[in-house]
Amino acid sequence: MQDPNADTEWNDILRKKGILPPKESLKELEEEAEEEQRILQQSVVKTYEDMTLEELDDHEDEFNEEDERAIEMYRRQRLAEWKVTKLKNKFGEVLEISGKDYVQEVTKAGEGLWVILHLYKQGIPLCALINQHLSGLARKFPDVKFIKAISTTCIPNYPDRNLPTIFVYLEGDIKAQFIGPLVFGGMNLTRDELEWKLSESGAIMTDLEENPKKPIEDVLLSSVRRSALMKRDSDSEGD
């Protein structure tokens, strides 16, 4: 049987008579092929956009050089995104250290890195409360390094009366220190209050709009006002 797509004089006559359909031009065929390749390329890229770095490595032998260039672009993009995510979520928890780790974890922590160190001891309720608050703050501010250590492992003979103690460092230098229970306000300390206190040192960027703990002056003034109102009401009832 004769090929209807062959370039023969007989086929040309049949096309003129309408017996055979018109033959597509070479240009049209090339355009169709390019369009098919473009669609295929898009589907390949779209598929690889959804893949992990490991999956990209597993399938790297399945495509030609042009495909590999597109895939390499997405691989680099995904790697950059992964590094940014990794950096933002560098910590996220309170690390336990001892004195031998101090230089590495604090002094050599890294350029531009804030470190918050809590010196504590087991059996001191306020220390336990602050450790609990710091765990929440570490999750909220994963770019800040929160660490804790039993006081005497870092500073021999450090007095218990100074506990809890928090030191705030930037590139190994102390930027703030909070020593003793009075500084923290005792067991009434809330996580927001601790967050605000640490934010004043510059270590964290709080989203709190104002100090959650009212200054002592405001508390005293409110107490005086309440006493005055109660006295006035009492005098009115006596009349």
Curated annotation (Swiss-Prot):
PANTHER family linked to this entry: PHOSDUCIN-LIKE PROTEIN 3, VIRAL IAP-ASSOCIATED FACTOR HOMOLOG
GO CC annotation, single: perinuclear region of cytoplasm
Compartments, record wording: Cytoplasm; Cytoplasm, Perinuclear region; Endoplasmic reticulum
Designated name of the protein: Phosducin-like protein 3
Region (Thioredoxin fold): 91-239
Pfam families associated with the record: Phosducin
Domain annotation Phosducin: ranges: 32-180
Predominant location category: cytoplasm
Keywords: Acetylation, Angiogenesis, Apoptosis, Chaperone, Cytoplasm, Endoplasmic reticulum, Host-virus interaction, Phosphoprotein
Domain of life per record: Eukaryota
Keyword Acetylation: yes
Modified residue annotations for N-acetylmethionine: M1
Family in the record: Belongs to the phosducin family.
Gene from which this protein is expressed: PDCL3
An MF annotation (GO) of this entry: protein folding chaperone
InterPro entries named in the record: Phosducin-like_chap/apop_reg, Phosducin_thioredoxin-like_dom, Thioredoxin-like_sf
A single GO BP: angiogenesis
Modification type Phosphoserine: residues: S43, S234, S236
Description of how the protein assembles with itself and partners: Interacts (via thioredoxin fold region) with KDR/VEGFR2 (via juxtamembrane domain). Forms ternary complexes with the chaperonin CCT complex and actin substrate, leading to inhibition of actin folding. Interacts with XIAP (via BIR 3 and RING domain). Interacts with HSP90AA1 and HSP90AB1.
Function description: Acts as a chaperone for the angiogenic VEGF receptor KDR/VEGFR2, increasing its abundance by inhibiting its ubiquitination and degradation. Inhibits the folding activity of the chaperonin-containing T-complex (CCT) which leads to inhibition of cytoskeletal actin folding. Acts as a chaperone during heat shock alongside HSP90 and HSP40/70 chaperone complexes. Modulates the activation of caspases during apoptosis.
Record NCBIfam families: phd_fam
